[in-house]
């Protein structure tokens, strides 16, 4: 089973295995700031329409998320551009004057998005998954953390069906 997430396509390419699916990688970054809030807050960026959230996290606040195209060879880190993007949106709605000095931690992750080659806008790419059987190799493309259990059941059923 090839369930390598963002590295699924690279693993296939390195082993000269063809697939009808392609993937785009999208990096999302989050900030944890020294701010205590009482309840979650959802904001919409006036610049690009993206949804940004603020979630209470003990005595801190989790802010997310960004969405940038990511190349497999690039480091998976929150960039200064992403920090500024999130802080500027929060500060445009709420008079907090948050700066980089308020950031106590940050993290980034890469989402593999499965698509056909005609899709240009990453916000329009489905967050669904695709499963492909290539002889005895099951390849999983895309997916979300929230649908992982369902995806696991589909793969399990595929194994049972194809194990003879």
Predicted regions, residues:
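Conserved NAD(P)H cofactor-binding loop of Rossmann-fold oxidoreductase domains
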Residues: 4
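C-terminal catalytic lobe of FAD-dependent flavoproteins
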Residues: 8-63, 68-164
């Amino acid at each position: 089973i090839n369930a390598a997430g963002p590295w699924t396509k690279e693993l296939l390419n390195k082993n000269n295995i063809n697939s009808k699916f392609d993937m785009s990688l999208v990096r999302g970054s989050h900030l944890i700031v020294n701010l205590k809030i009482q309840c979650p807050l959802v904001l919409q960026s006036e610049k690009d329409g993206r949804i940004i959230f603020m979630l209470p996290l003990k005595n801190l606040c989790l802010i997310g998320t960004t969405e940038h195209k990511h190349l497999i060879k690039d480091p998976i880190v929150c960039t200064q551009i992403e920090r500024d993007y999130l802080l500027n949106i929060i500060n445009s709605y709420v008079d907090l004057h948050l700066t980089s000095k308020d950031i106590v931690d940050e993290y980034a992750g890469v989402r593999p998005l499965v698509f056909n080659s005609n899709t240009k806008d990453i916000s329009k790419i489905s967050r669904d998954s695709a499963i492909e059987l290539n002889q005895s190799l099951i390849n999983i493309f895309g997916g979300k953390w929230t649908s992982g259990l369902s995806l696991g059941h589909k793969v399990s059923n595929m194994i049972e069906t194809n194990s003879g």
